[in-house]
Regions:
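Positively charged, polar, low-complexity stretches
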Residues: 1-81
């Protein structure tokens, strides 16, 4: 694993195991094949607070920022959440 991926892996570790799993899934299965804009969006998405991420991923509140919403939607459709 390269240094950037290792840093992202660490940043995917959250205060909730469920978030760890969802964000880790994206990193493991989608990140490498993403374009540079999506990679940058994922990195900034990881700067958000856990409660906000959780609400977006559970569909409780909409994610208004389009680049993040694309990632959130992809994660949500992974398990038909």
């Amino acid at each position: 694993m390269n240094t950037d991926a290792s840093r992202l892996r660490w940043r995917c570790r959250r205060g909730m195991r469920e978030l760890d799993q969802l964000l880790g899934w994206y990193l493991d299965t989608r990140y490498a094949g993403s374009d540079d804009a999506a990679k940058a969006a994922f990195s900034t998405l990881l700067d958000q607070q856990d409660p906000e991420l959780w609400d977006w991923l559970m569909g409780r509140t909409p994610c208004e920022f389009l680049p993040w919403r694309r990632i959130v939607d992809e994660i949500r459709t992974r398990d038909h959440i």
